[in-house]
């Protein structure tokens, strides 16, 4: 295995103990960088709502300047976070394109809201269905039967799937060690049909194909770093706007917002969100998703 940064071969003696992707020198440098990034994220989170709106508009504008208005799109879920993002983006670019991935596992209230946005609120939305490159339609049932059920969290489900599908004994043992270190309490579920592939098959892959088909180059997402460990980690590594660094160009201009900011914005600007939230739900997501059941 090679150091992620300097590509030096990693051994028992030169591997950084807290992050085994790095040698000691690079790991120490990276740790310092992440520590400074964490301070930056804290400062951004402490800003008032008006300042956050200004910063969010700046980040959206950067994406449009970098790629062109006809090459960017709002990845729209119909939830309150992406609806706030849409409201801000449309105040700048009224006709900005929205792509909505209908996973076939949506709440009826979400579908109703999408219909309202398109037909009554004038939002430029294209609905994307989960059809793969071969033209086959995927459903939640098909994903579960083929790969397994989405349970606990994406990290846990991914760890279990990696363990189950290891191609060598060494990989299987490494996966077992990873489960032991990070998810000991879920080890008893490691032989059950659990996977993190659901979102890939029903949402991410169809959106990527549609974006490529339309010649789009950058997704603007309404995700918050506070929503999960992985999203915060991702922000610490890359920040809000990630251009020309990874497989997909992304702008995540709400990353430093929190749920309180979202609710305050909705109230201040009288933003319409799905009736789902009036029924006691805190998120929209997919109806039968098992991520979060451990919380």
Positions of PLM-derived features:
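Cys/His-rich microdomains that often coordinate metals
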Residues: 10-11, 30, 105, 293
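Short linker/helix segments within small regulatory modules
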Residues: 12-21, 278-281
């Amino acid at each position: 295995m090679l150091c992620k940064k300097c590509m030096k071969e990693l051994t028992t003696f030169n591997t950084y103990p807290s992050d085994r992707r790095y040698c000691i020198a690079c790991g120490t440098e990276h740790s310092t960088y992440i520590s400074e990034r964490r301070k930056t994220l804290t400062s951004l989170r402490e800003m008032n709502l008006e300042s956050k709106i200004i910063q969010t508009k700046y980040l959206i504008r950067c994406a449009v300047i970098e790629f062109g208005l006809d090459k960017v799109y709002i990845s729209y879920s119909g939830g309150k976070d992406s609806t706030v993002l849409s409201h801000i983006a449309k105040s700048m670019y009224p006709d900005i394109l929205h792509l909505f991935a209908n996973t076939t596992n949506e709440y009826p209230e979400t579908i109703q809201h999408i219909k309202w946005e398109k037909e009554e609120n004038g939002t430029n939305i294209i609905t994307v269905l989960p059809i793969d490159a071969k033209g086959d339609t995927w459903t939640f049932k098909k994903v579960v039967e083929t790969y397994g059920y989405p349970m606990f969290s994406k990290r846990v489900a991914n760890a279990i799937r990696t363990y189950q599908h290891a191609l060598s004994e060494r990989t299987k043992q490494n996966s077992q060690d990873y489960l032991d270190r990070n998810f000991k309490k879920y080890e008893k579920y490691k032989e059950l049909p659990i996977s993190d592939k659901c979102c890939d098959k029903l949402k991410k892959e169809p959106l990527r194909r549609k974006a490529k088909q339309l010649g789009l180059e950058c997704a603007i997402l309404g995700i918050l770093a506070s929503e999960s460990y992985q999203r915060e980690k991702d922000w610490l590594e890359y920040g809000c706007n990630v251009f020309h660094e990874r497989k997909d160009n992304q702008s995540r201009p709400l990353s430093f917002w929190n749920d309180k900011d979202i609710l305050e914005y909705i109230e201040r600007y009288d933003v319409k969100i799905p009736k789902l939230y009036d029924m006691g739900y805190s998120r929209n997501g997919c109806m039968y998703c098992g991520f979060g059941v451990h919380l």
